[in-house]
A protein has these predicted regions:
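Mg2+-dependent phosphoryl-transfer enzymes with acidic/Ser/Thr/Gly-rich catalytic loops
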Residues: 44-51, 78, 84-86, 90-92, ...
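Short coil/turn segments at beta-strand junctions that form active-site/ligand-binding loops
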Residues: 21-23, 66, 114-115
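Non-catalytic pre-domain segments flanking phosphatase-related domains
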Residues: 1-27, 175-182
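Short, flexible loop segments at the rims of nucleotide/cofactor-binding pockets, characterized by
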Residues: 3-4, 9, 45-48, 69, ...
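Asp-based phosphoryl-transfer active-site loop
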Residues: 19-38, 129, 162
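Basic, amphipathic juxtamembrane/active-site segments
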Residues: 37-59
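Substrate-recognition element of Asp-dependent hydrolases with the DxDx(T/V) motif
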Residues: 58-82, 129
Length: 182
């Protein structure tokens, strides 16, 4: 039996039950996949840092049949390239109305909102929370987002939050390396 890592959030029984029926995980990018930092070079190019550890977690979810996507206001070519490399099922970059995008995904994929989780870190993500069945926030999220979230992760965006949520979701479904730790 694998012990539950002390540095990861352990959901309450009610949240664990809701996580166990999820069919889709949708995520914001800046502040979730990244720490929100945008680097600029002398020639004006932008750069963002993504974690391969987070990417591996996404791969684990996809292998388990979970729909994975991003809904982000930031319209960044770097972000699009990274999400395409991860072969996400839904890529919505430059989304000005996150709730509308979420409702569209739910309808097109014939999902019930209770089957969808959203992880966001800042005030614009609260609209997406209104559509999601499970609302998740990284440790570094805005206080209002943490207060609204059903689950607040121990890891911060850009520093393992995505991997943590992937492992927690899989464990709640009885899958993945942490399944026996619940």
């Amino acid at each position: 039996m694998t012990a539950w890592p002390g540095h990861w959030a352990r959901p309450t029984e009610g949240v664990r039950e809701r996580l166990s029926v999820l069919q889709a995980l949708l995520l914001d990018v800046d502040g979730v996949f990244t720490d929100g930092t945008v680097l600029r070079t002398e020639d004006g190019q932008e750069a963002r840092r993504f974690s391969v550890v987070d990417g591996h977690g996404i791969g684990m979810l996809r292998e388990a049949g979970v729909i994975v996507g991003v809904v982000s206001r930031e319209n960044s070519a770097i972000t699009r390239a990274r999400m395409e490399k991860l072969q996400l099922d839904e890529i919505h970059i430059g989304a000005t109305d996150k709730a509308a995008v979420m409702r569209d995904i739910v309808a097109r994929r014939a999902l019930n909102p209770a089957q969808v989780a959203f992880i966001g870190d800042d005030l614009p993500d609260l609209a997406a929370f209104d559509v999601a069945g499970v609302r998740i926030a990284p440790a570094n999220a805005h206080p209002a987002v943490r207060e609204t979230a059903d689950l607040v992760l121990h890891c911060s965006g850009g520093h393992g939050a995505v991997r943590e949520v992937c492992e927690v979701l899989l464990a709640a479904r009885g899958e993945g390396p942490m399944a026996n730790g619940f």
